[in-house]
């Protein structure tokens, strides 16, 4: 599971629009589907259960840090930073 910790534009400026702010802090599963990242949000940023999906625009590049496990996904419009979340299961 991963948590969306930050969403920026291509220049690194944090996105402050409502939809982007609502996505930050979500915890869930991420997978590639049709060239996009489909993020199944299982918990909102307050830790309350939710069951929604977030789909990015077309992915141009992504990198996974081998030490921290952080994934950085660069889309046509945004950069998503996702940190691994350890679960008790």
Q: What is the predicted role of each segment?
A:
Residues 56-89:
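Short, compact, well-ordered microdomains
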Residues 1-67:
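N-terminal non-globular leader segments, chiefly Sec-dependent signal peptides
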């Amino acid at each position: 599971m991963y948590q969306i910790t930050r969403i920026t534009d291509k220049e690194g400026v944090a996105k402050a629009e409502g939809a982007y702010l609502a996505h930050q802090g979500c915890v869930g599963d991420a997978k590639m589907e049709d060239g996009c990242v489909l993020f199944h949000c299982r918990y909102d940023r307050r830790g309350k259960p939710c069951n929604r999906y977030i789909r990015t625009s077309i992915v141009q590049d992504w990198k996974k840090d081998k030490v921290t496990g952080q994934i950085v996904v660069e889309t046509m419009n945004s950069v998503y930073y996702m940190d691994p979340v350890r679960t008790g299961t």
